[in-house]
C-alpha cells in the first residue's frame, strides 16, 4: 500500500519506527514521471526495504524566465504509477511546507563544479538543487538515495554534497534510460512538437559518433580534442538544434590533462530543440 504525505512531520513519524531494522531509500523527483523515474524506483527497491519518492517542483532551482509555471504537474497520474511500482511512501509537500520563507535565507552552494556545463546558462540552478536535496536528506534521513545519470552534473554535485557535509548516505547513480529511438527520457520531452520529436534522437546519434572518434582517434592535446568537439557542435546545430554546451571531461567532471592514459571520459551536452532543452551524455571507456 502506497501512502502519500504532504507534511514533513507526518512523514517523519511514519519513518521513525522503521529505522531500527529497515533500510530506507529516497528517490527525489519533480513529478511528471516516466519510465526513467520508474527505473530509479526499481533500483532503490533493490537496495532498500522502504522506498520514499518525493514529488516537488522546486522553485529555487528555476531561473528567471524558465518553465517553473508551465512545468507539468501530474500528481494523480504519478501516484498511480508509483502505486503500481510498489512504492511505500510518496512525499508531496507544498512550497510553503518546504520553504516557510521564500526565497530561503539559507543557501547550500556547490562551488566550482556548479559553474560550468549547465551552470553557465543556469547560474543559480544548482544552488537551488543544493538546498532542496539537503532538506530532503534531513527530512527523510535515508540510507540510500538514487539519482539518474542523465543529470550527470547534478549527480556529481550530490556526491560532493554528501562527502562535504558528512552525510551517511549511499548515493547510487542510475543508468540513463532511452526511448527505442535513442532519445534520453525526460519530463521536458513533451515540449517537443511532432516534427521535433523525430529530430530529437539525432542528438544521441551525434554523441555516439563522437564517442567512437574519441575511442579510436589518438588525441595528444586539448587542441585536438576541441577540434572534434567543435565539429560535433556544428553537426548538431546543422541538424536543427541550438547547442548550449558540449564538453568532454573526466568522469568526475575534472578537466582532462592526461591524454595518454586509460580514457575514463564523459561527453555531456545540452541543446535546445524548439522549446525543449535536452540533456544527454555518454561515458567513454577505452
Curated annotation (Swiss-Prot):
It comes from the Bacteria. GO terms for molecular function: ATP binding; pantoate-beta-alanine ligase activity. (R)-pantoate binds at residues 61, 154. Pfam families: Pantoate_ligase. The keyword Nucleotide-binding applies. Pathway: Cofactor biosynthesis; (R)-pantothenate biosynthesis; (R)-pantothenate from (R)-pantoate and beta-alanine: step 1/1. It is found in: Cytoplasm. Keywords: ATP-binding, Cytoplasm, Ligase, Nucleotide-binding, Pantothenate biosynthesis. GO terms for cellular component: cytosol. GO terms for biological process: pantothenate biosynthetic process. It catalyses: (R)-pantoate + beta-alanine + ATP = (R)-pantothenate + AMP + diphosphate + H(+). Gene3D superfamilies: HUPs, Pantoate-beta-alanine ligase, C-terminal domain. InterPro entries: Pantoate_ligase, Pantoate_ligase_C, Rossmann-like_a/b/a_fold. The active site is at 37 (proton donor). Its main location: cytoplasm. Its EC number is 6.3.2.1. Disulfide bonds: none annotated. Homodimer. Belongs to the pantothenate synthetase family. Catalyzes the condensation of pantoate with beta-alanine in an ATP-dependent reaction via a pantoyl-adenylate intermediate. HAMAP family: PanC. NCBIfam families: panC. The reaction proceeds by a bi uni uni bi ping pong mechanism. This is Pantothenate synthetase. It comes from Psychrobacter sp. (strain PRwf-1).
